[in-house]
Amino acid sequence: MKKIVYTGGIYGDEFVKYIFDRKIRVESLKTIWERMSHLPVQHDGFKEYINVADEKMRVFDSKNEAFVRCKQIIRSPMEANPWYQITFDDDSTIIVTGKTRFPVKGKSLSRYEKKYIDELFAGEVLVGVDYGAAADSKDKFKNVSNEEDDIEYIITDLFEKKIVRVTKIDKASNESFQLVTDTGLFDVSGTLILDAKMR
């Protein structure tokens, strides 16, 4: 099962809790990239990524309450501003690029809408969304259709986070980062998010 993903990037100073070289570390995404930059850097258009699956790197995933295998670290050095900070009702925040799209609850509980960050407003609820669920999981998932993509999506119990505030902020960096994990989830600065697109 794959995840509907955030298509934007995460600010390099956001932190991740992870295990590497037998140590639990809490470091920024930029520091993790620099730590792993001794490995070959691959290119995919303007994005760069490092395959870390063989490095025994594990990233914390609060949904599964475990450190899960990290497969890739992705850097987009040409990712342009603006940056936005989202504040949630549990006081957690995350800084992401304006290209980020989020699944949010629609008018019907069985539907969701995908919105770019500059279309979000206070009171909307971010939801976890999967696609391609197995037939034997029907009791756990609720089918919805989304005419925009002509794909059947399902809302899950991954998470719901109410947005309190979306703030456009000025950041000096023009690079963003993403991770790919085995579970498709990881925590950034205390916020559980869906990972980058699987390659």
Residue ranges: model-predicted function:
Residues 1-199:
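Autoprocessing domains of the Hint superfamily
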